[in-house]
């Protein structure tokens, strides 16, 4: 449910010898990658797609980014994904830009991208997910019947803007809007699981953080009430796809839950016909 090939930007390890490349290696080590430089392989879209196929992944979500410090345009996401049926594009908007609402409608209605990613905690100024200025973003996504993806995790500059209770407030105000929480709002695992328990329109993608201390709580919840709301994600390039699939299968998910978290939940959420 979440990947970005390295060639998209230096931040994802596009250029060896840069400080960004070293940061990508560092993060890979922190989340348990066996090969901290595996992402070098995705220097082209063809190599990235080959890795997706080798990992046995039927469909991989490729997400843009639009923050004050890093932008990958939605047109670029379309260019990368459209030739490859196994790649699903998710648009991104900076909600503080004046054209944010128009860009959402363009990305969905003209480009055909499958959802909208926002990262309010990375904004200038940073915002909580429940900041009223974001309500028009949620409203237009609700009207377009597409999911909104919230990215928040330990790398959020200030974790005060990554509190799960803010997601709960949005879920209550927009009960028909699917809200997908990238990085599973780690490290606030108990809290976000509690929010997802209360609001069935909240989905969790813990991706690489499911392998860190406390991450087994996601598995425990998915073996119970969360089986329709948890989704697999690789967080590539910060974790290798093949290793992540293998490690994920060994986390202790019950057999009847695996189809949901690996495939069916994403298919339903993104209205795919795979």
Feature locations, PLM:
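Structural motif corresponding to alpha-helix initiation and N-cap regions
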Residues: 42-46, 71-74, 97-101, 131, ...
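Active-site gating/metal-coordination segments in enzymes
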Residues: 58-59, 67-150, 155-156, 198
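Conserved, mostly hydrophobic/aromatic
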Residues: 52, 77, 107, 116, ...
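Conserved residues at the C-terminal ends of beta-strands
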Residues: 63, 119, 264
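Generic structural signal for well-ordered alpha-helices
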Residues: 45-49, 74-81, 104-105, 134, ...
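Catalytic pocket-lining loop regions of alpha/beta-barrel enzymes
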Residues: 114-115, 127-231
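Mid-to-C-terminal alpha-helical segments outside catalytic/metal-binding sites
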Residues: 4-55, 59, 226-229, 239-274
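Residue-level marker for beta-strand->alpha-helix junctions and adjacent short loops that shape enzyme
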Residues: 67, 96, 123, 155, ...
């Amino acid at each position: 449910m979440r990947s970005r090939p390295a060639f998209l930007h230096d931040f994802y390890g596009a250029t060896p010898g840069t400080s960004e490349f070293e940061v990508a290696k560092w993060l890979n080590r922190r989340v348990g990658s066996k090969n901290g430089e595996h992402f070098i392989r995705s220097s082209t879209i063809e190599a990235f797609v080959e890795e997706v196929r080798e990992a046995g992944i039927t469909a991989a979500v490729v997400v843009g980014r639009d923050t004050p410090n890093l932008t990958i345009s939605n047109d670029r996401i379309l260019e990368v994904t459209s030739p490859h049926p196994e790649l699903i594009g998710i648009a991104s908007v900076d909600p503080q830009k004046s054209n944010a609402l128009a860009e959402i409608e363009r990305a969905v209605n003209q480009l055909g991208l499958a959802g909208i990613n926002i990262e309010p905690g990375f904004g200038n100024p940073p915002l909580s997910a429940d900041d009223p200025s974001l309500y028009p973003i949620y409203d237009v996504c609700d009207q377009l019947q597409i999911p909104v993806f919230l990215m928040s995790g330990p790398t959020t500059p200030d974790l005060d803007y990554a509190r799960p209770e803010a997601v709960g407030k949005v879920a209550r105000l927009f009960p028909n809007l699917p809200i997908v929480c990238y990085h599973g709002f780690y490290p606030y695992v108990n809290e976000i699981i509690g929010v997802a328990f209360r609001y069935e329109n909240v989905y969790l993608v813990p991706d690489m953080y499911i392998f860190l201390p406390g991450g087994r709580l996601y598995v425990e919840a998915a073996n119970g009430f969360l089986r329709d709301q948890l989704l697999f994600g690789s967080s590539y390039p910060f974790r290798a796809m093949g290793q992540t699939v293998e490690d994920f299968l060994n986390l202790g998910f019950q057999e009847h839950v695996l189809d949901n978290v690996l495939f069916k939940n994403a298919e339903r959420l993104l209205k795919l016909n795979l």
